[in-house]
């Protein structure tokens, strides 16, 4: 079924990919992205592991109504989460050579 050394080479390749995957996962966990809402009036900085690091609110919004501010914060959080997902896909594509994961499968983090 496998030629001479074929199984050994396959195992080496699998180990190399696993090592690369671990490095990329560490890199993703350390990265930070910023999501925005209200044309940048609200900004949320989030890590690759979806932890919110910082929320910035333009002072002009503090005079407006509370509900609008809450909506903008939620929208900025959602934008940051979307950007994290996009960054994760890009980083993982570097490791997998662009192979797509089956529909519904998430990355292991």
Curated annotation (Swiss-Prot):
InterPro entries: YbaB-like_sf, YbaB/EbfC. Pfam families: YbaB_DNA_bd (PF02575). GO terms for cellular component: bacterial nucleoid; cytosol. It is found in: Cytoplasm, Nucleoid. Residues 87-109 are annotated as: Disordered. Keywords: Cytoplasm, DNA-binding. One of its GO terms (molecular function) is DNA binding. Homodimer. Binds to DNA and alters its conformation. May be involved in regulation of gene expression, nucleoid organization and DNA protection. Belongs to the YbaB/EbfC family. PANTHER family: NUCLEOID-ASSOCIATED PROTEIN YBAB (PTHR33449:SF1). This is Nucleoid-associated protein Shew_2234. It comes from Shewanella loihica (strain ATCC BAA-1088 / PV-4).
